Design a protein with these regions (language model features):
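Short, Lys/Arg-enriched N-terminal segments with co-localized hydrophobic residues
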Residues: 6-28
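Domain-level signal for Mg2+-assisted phosphodiester chemistry and nucleotide/NA-binding surfaces
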Residues: 21-152, 159-169
Length: 170
């Protein structure tokens, strides 16, 4: 017999992990499955721990997940780490400010993300669950704070720069 419990960690020590599952079997060994929201983790890790190479970030994630098991020390066993994310976008997208197409496949972020995902695939206990990006809802938009200032006539369109745009992918 196996029981299943879902634990959503508080915003304390485990704030980078959204949830993890605890599977308890008859042998009293607690098997833990950790679920990682990939986009959220990368964003938070870059902010908290700084920029790193793809291999360093993958190793960091593995150690970070295992550290949660060591803190508990109640006979836990790592069943699997489920990493949820989408593959990087490889489209040509029109940039309205530059007035030209940007090939995202040639970007450093595309290369880094593919390397990172390949690193995770090669690690033990990791299972990647890849989603799909919408094919129609992709483009550059003006950042909300600049759009608000533009609509309130606090700035004019001539004050808008390339840095005021961000890629919006859904």
């Amino acid at each position: 017999m196996c029981s299943l419990g879902v634990v959503i960690p508080p915003y304390g020590k485990r704030r980078n992990l959204r949830a993890f599952f605890i599977l308890k079997g008859d042998d009293e060994m607690i098997r833990v499955a950790i679920l990682v929201d990939g986009g959220y983790y990368i964003k938070r890790a870059n902010r908290l721990f700084g920029q790193k190479t793809a291999a360093e970030r993958a190793t960091e994630l593995e150690e970070y997940c295992k550290k949660h098991l060591l803190q508990d020390k109640t006979g836990t066993y790592l069943y699997r780490i489920f990493y949820y994310d989408c593959p990087p976008c490889d489209k040509n997208i029109y940039h309205p400010f530059l007035q030209r197409n940007i090939n995202l496949k040639k970007s450093d972020l595309y290369t880094w993300m593919n390397t990172f995902l390949n690193e995770l695939k090669s690690k033990r206990k990791f299972a990647l669950r890849m989603g799909r990006l919408s094919s129609n809802d992709t483009g550059y938009i003006i950042k909300p704070e600049k759009m608000k200032a533009l609509c309130a006539n606090k700035i004019s369109f001539s004050d808008i720069t390339e840095d005021n745009f961000r890629l919006d992918i859904k």
